Amino acid sequence: MLYDEAKNVLYAEERAEFFIRKLGFDFDKIDKNEIIFLLNKEFERAITERESKFYDSSECLRVLCGYLYCLGDVSDIPLLEKIKYGIDMNVGTMIDSEWIDSLENGGIEDKYTQTRKEIIKGFVDYYESWLWSNQYSDKGNYPLAYSVYF
């Protein structure tokens, strides 16, 4: 299971990269239940890290929430909200409200929300670029600036 392979990776950015490389972006081949399992484990880890004053789970939680959005439906909103609002402001700002709004409205474009197809494309494009950046970074696994919003 993916969690067993990643649980000893200290930094969230490295775990995020590991999951993206293992899962890829062919959402028809990704098990939604595995993403839910990974999200719950990462959430538990984030709570433990916060209690020990070492907090580094934002990027990994964001990646896994993005995967859940791409695979999910309205029934997944409570888990996305639990993660978005249940830890701290860092995680809250990393999880896009647009993902939750899109699941609530059936993926239809409105004044503040792109279509589900556009949001998924933005997620994939961002993380493909992020992987490329990590691959060629002098310093290792550092993500692009968080100035890209979907």
Features from the language model and the residues they span:
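TPR-adjacent "capping" and linker segments in tetratricopeptide-repeat scaffold/adaptor proteins
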Residues: 4-10, 51-52, 107-127
